[in-house]
């Protein structure tokens, strides 16, 4: 029973992080969704035997009007939590088909333990859509809420252009952030996109730096 309760609690926290992550990317998520209590989560997600049904945690999200003004190419997004501990080809193929047939621009696949190498090879086949994978355990805590993680803000194309022109820079002269960077993954950064990083300074209050995703 304790193990089940612990699993449900961790799943609830991961679900909250995913909702926050999707909202921080510019999608419409209500505060009520993020603030869902553990008791309400349990009543919605668990069956009569108190076993969590991850398929009930899947959801679609659409960009806000404000986000579309800044990022016109931002399309709808689908998040899926997988009930299987180890993800094989069949499950990943079904996920890829769902993303393609429903014309989602992004699919976020949350797995429990592992994805087989063969299943991973299917991910690029949904292009131009993109699929991102996250392990449940990596989402229990929202890394962007940590005191030592500075605020990262993705720039629009015109903001990036203005930045390069203002400082007379080429893209190759900007410091880099890898797509595998934890915050880069959280924001879903793609190659060529630039983030503004705001840090606190004891002398100047706050200062901004910029990094380009490679």
UniProtKB/Swiss-Prot annotation:
GO biological process, one term: termination of RNA polymerase III transcription
Record keyword Nucleus present: yes
Broad class of the protein's primary localization: nucleus
Top-level taxon of the source organism: Eukaryota
UniProt entry keywords in alphabetical sequence: Nucleus, Transcription
A GO term, aspect molecular function: DNA-directed RNA polymerase activity
Transmembrane segments: none
Compartments reported by the entry: Nucleus
Record-level GO cellular component terms: RNA polymerase I complex; RNA polymerase II, core complex; RNA polymerase III complex
Chain coiled-coil ranges: none
PROSITE patterns: RNA_POL_H_23KD
One Pfam family it belongs to: RNA_pol_Rpb5_N
Oligomeric and partner information: Component of the RNA polymerase I (Pol I), RNA polymerase II (Pol II) and RNA polymerase III (Pol III) complexes consisting of at least 14, 12 and 17 subunits, respectively.
HAMAP family xref list: RNApol_Rpo5_RPB5
Record function comment: DNA-dependent RNA polymerase catalyzes the transcription of DNA into RNA using the four ribonucleoside triphosphates as substrates. Common component of RNA polymerases I, II and III which synthesize ribosomal RNA precursors, mRNA precursors and many functional non-coding RNAs, and small RNAs, such as 5S rRNA and tRNAs, respectively. Pol II is the central component of the basal RNA polymerase II transcription machinery. Pols are composed of mobile elements that move relative to each other.
Recorded family membership: Belongs to the archaeal Rpo5/eukaryotic RPB5 RNA polymerase subunit family.
Name of the protein in its database record: DNA-directed RNA polymerases I, II, and III subunit RPABC1
């Amino acid at each position: 029973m304790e193990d089940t309760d612990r699993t449900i609690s961790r799943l609830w926290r991961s679900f909250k992080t995913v909702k926050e992550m999707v909202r921080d990317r510019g999608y419409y998520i209500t505060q009520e969704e993020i603030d869902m209590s553990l008791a309400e989560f349990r009543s919605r997600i668990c069956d009569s035997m108190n076993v969590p049904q991850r398929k009930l945690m899947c959801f679609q999200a659409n960009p806000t009007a404000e986000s579309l003004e800044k990022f016109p190419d931002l399309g709808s997004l689908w998040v899926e939590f997988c009930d299987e501990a180890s993800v094989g080809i069949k499950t990943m193929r079904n996920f890829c088909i769902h993303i393609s047939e429903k014309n989602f621009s992004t699919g976020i696949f949350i797995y429990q333990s592992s994805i087989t190498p063969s299943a991973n090879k299917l991910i690029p086949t949904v292009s131009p859509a993109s699929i991102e994978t996250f392990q449940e355990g990596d989402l229990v805590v929202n890394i962007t809420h940590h005191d030592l993680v500075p605020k990262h803000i993705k720039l629009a194309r015109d903001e990036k252009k203005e930045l390069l022109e203002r400082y007379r820079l080429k893209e190759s002269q900007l410091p880099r952030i890898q797509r595998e960077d934890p915050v880069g993954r959280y924001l879903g950064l793609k190659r060529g996109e630039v983030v503004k990083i705001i840090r606190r300074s004891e002398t100047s209050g706050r200062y901004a730096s910029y990094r380009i995703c490679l």
